[in-house]
């Protein structure tokens, strides 16, 4: 019993380390290209393409049966490239020639392309494309049966946007305005006559003209610390951690006593 428990804990710890250390990025895609030409007959010369691209990222996760201080942080998952796109065309010739062509695709994900030409017949010469792109991200999760202080922070998942549906740069930019003509400079004002020393009485000068130190009001703001770590308050985390540690100890002693 003791050896089985020890092997199970070691296996779980190894699996958790592998999952937590995996920061994957899916760059692969799926594509299809087909052509049908010169296929006379009924319902002939048709092309159906359905490439499926399902990238799955699993990173920054912890799985513990009995675990303490097993964090997973700073992992990133990303699916680069665009989404699915493609064309759907179908022109069936009733007793004539059916021609259909289409090119679909994007810079990533799943894409399909092809054409159908010179296929006489009823319901022939059709071309159907159904590219599917379904990215799945699972990151930054913590699963504990009996565990304490196993945070998952700083884990990111991202899927790159499609290239076909993006707006070309510069379409919404406002052109720079024309420079205004500078106005004619006005006549300079005649400088005032400097006042004599007898014009001002000592003590009548304002505070703005008096040399010396001046008090400047500082902007008031509430002091705040950067928000880091978990949202769980410390007063609740410590009792929960102690209880989890005690529960793990009790389970271990029961397993040891039953041997």
From Swiss-Prot:
One of its GO terms (biological process) is cell adhesion. Keywords: Amyloid, Cell adhesion, Cell wall, Peptidoglycan-anchor, Repeat, Secreted, Signal. A motif (LPXTG sorting signal) lies at residues 225-229. Residues 180-189 have a biased composition (Low complexity). Residues 1-28 form the signal peptide. Residues 84-112 have a biased composition (Gly residues). Residues 39-79, 119-159 form the Chaplin domain. Pfam families: ChpA-C (PF03777). It is found in: Secreted; Secreted, Cell wall. One of 8 partially redundant surface-active proteins required for efficient formation of aerial mycelium; the short chaplins assemble into a hydrophobic, amyloidal fibrillar surface layer that envelopes and protects aerial hyphae and spores, presumably anchored to the long chaplins. Chaplins have an overlapping function with the surface-active SapB peptide; chaplins are essential on minimal medium while on rich medium both chaplins and SapB are required for efficient aerial hyphae formation. Belongs to the chaplin family. Long chaplin subfamily. This is Chaplin-C. The lineage of its organism: Bacteria, Bacillati, Actinomycetota, Actinomycetes, Kitasatosporales.
């Amino acid at each position: 019993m003791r050896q089985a428990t020890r092997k199970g804990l070691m296996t779980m710890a190894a699996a958790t380390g592998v999952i937590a250390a995996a920061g994957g990025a899916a760059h692969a895609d799926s594509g299809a290209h087909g052509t049908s030409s010169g296929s006379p007959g009924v319902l002939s010369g048709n092309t159906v393409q359905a490439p499926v691209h399902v990238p799955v990222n699993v990173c920054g996760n912890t799985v513990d049966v009995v675990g303490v201080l097993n964090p997973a942080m700073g992992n990133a998952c990303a699916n680069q490239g665009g989404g699915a796109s493609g064309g759907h065309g179908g022109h069936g010739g009733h007793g004539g020639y059916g021609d259909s062509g289409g090119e679909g695709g994007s810079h990533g994900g799943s894409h399909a392309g092809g054409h159908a030409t010179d296929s006489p017949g009823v319901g022939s010469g059709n071309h159907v494309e159904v590219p599917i792109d379904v990215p799945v991200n699972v990151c930054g999760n913590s699963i504990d049966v009996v565990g304490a202080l196993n945070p998952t922070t700083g884990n990111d998942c991202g899927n790159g946007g499609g290239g076909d549906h993006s707006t070309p740069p510069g379409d919404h930019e406002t052109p720079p305005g024309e420079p205004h003509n500078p106005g004619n400079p006005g006549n300079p004002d005649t400088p005032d006559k400097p006042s004599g020393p007898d014009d001002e009485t000592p003590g009548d000068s304002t505070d703005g003209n008096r040399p010396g130190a001046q008090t400047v009001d500082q902007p008031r703001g509430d002091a705040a610390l950067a928000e880091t770590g978990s949202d769980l308050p410390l007063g609740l985390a410590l009792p929960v951690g102690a209880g989890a540690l005690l529960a793990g100890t009790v389970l271990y002693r029961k397993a040891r006593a039953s041997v």
